[in-house]
Amino acid sequence: ARTFQNIRLFEHMTVIENVMVGAHSRSYSALWGAFSGAVLHRPFAQPAVEKTMRDRAFELLDFMGLGKKMDEGAEDLAYGERRRLEIARALAIEPRLLLLDEPAAGMNPNETLELDEHIKRIRDRGVTIVLVEHDMNLVMGISDQITVLNFGEKIAEGPPSTVQSDPVVIEAYLGEEEVL
């Protein structure tokens, strides 16, 4: 599963319906059913399937700190909440690997700290996280292994402490040290 740098939600749907769309691929593959249901604003017509997906969606929303907002419109959420909703929807397909493309982009420090905790909890559930991110505090706090690219070329790889002190990484991202 993956999320995008620019948040992509179904604005006209509720918070829980957004997650249920993600769970749809795990329940049955009636693609037409998903689209026709959305058009009719009845996203999931089979009651037993809908209940199972709704229960799973609520569990994910609760896990991501959004359980109390399940019936609100996705467009009404704050920025950090919208990001967490997008991640909950990605988790609905029960991935073993989750690609997060700059999840902290545009977040304030409090939202980033909250995101950090949620990503760690996802990792603790056994989901491998591939993180593309420029917030180095977030990267260093979450990562077990880091690969650093400079203009598409790998310049370092290893645990955070090794990468953080690598002279090639420091030069690429901070510039050369000048001796006066």
Positions of PLM-derived features:
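Glycine-rich phosphate-binding loops of nucleotide-dependent enzymes
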Residues: 1-180
